[in-house]
Amino acid sequence: MDQIYDVIIIGGGAAATSAAMTLKNRGKTFAVVANKAETGSLYKAEKITNYPGLPPMSGAEMTELFRQQLIDTGATIIEGRALSVLPMEGTFGVAVGSDYYMAGSIILTAGITREKLYPGEAEYLGRGVSYCATCDGMLYRGKTVAVVGGGEEAKQDADFLESIGCSVLRFEKNGRYEISGGMKANLLKFAGEEYPVDCVFIIKDTVSVTQLVPGLSYENGGILVDRRMATAVPGVFAAGDCTGKPLQLAKAVGEGNVAALSACDYLDKK
């Protein structure tokens, strides 16, 4: 994409909505990378009773309110999974599926990833482990690959890989998968069986922030930030559940506002 946004927000929940509203008020250009609303933890909450100014309502109802407010900011909404964020000479490149977007600053509001990494997943990422079939599939044309994950996206990725000539092993069941190899991953273990493969494509709703952005620091299970919501990577800010406990809605909204103001200050001083 030719356009370089001032800010890209990764995540579409309460912190993201708060950040987007602030960026709009400050006259910045911004895009929001978000999965479908129903994949968020707020959506699944039975009832929210502790948010000031609003009556008790279900998580799904509150998610819809936030999503409409997000749309009303005029943000460019990019539906999909952010796969990586890479610093690039004063800007950042964000990979979403097979597309690429650029921004001067990043705000992480991706919540928390409750799924644990499989053994070998982090070690072999980029060396026989991939989160994106359309990005990396052609590298394994004519070879044997595994697709781990259920749902429509996993099915579409497996179908695509077969269409380009890959021999595809499909794994839809939950359980313990283990990836091993030498310089590159070449073996997938599951349910007591071993499967020689050239690549393992792992399809999840979100990519953990520990895999998303290189160079971040962590403390007590969350991204380490200062009072400005600045991370250890200049130009990258974080807000909401991804910064750690308490995992509260009001905290996420406040941090989203602060992160956006700090991103604006960062951009204005460049």
Question: Which role does the model predict for each range below?
Answer:
Residues E64, L70-E89, V94-A95, Y101-A103, ...:
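A Rossmann-like FAD-binding core segment of flavoenzymes
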Residues I4-D6, E79-G80, R141-T144, V233:
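Phosphate-coordination loops involved in phosphoryl transfer and adenosine-cofactor binding
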Residues G111-R114, D205-V207:
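Short glycine-rich anion-binding loops that position phosphate/pyrophosphate groups of nucleotides
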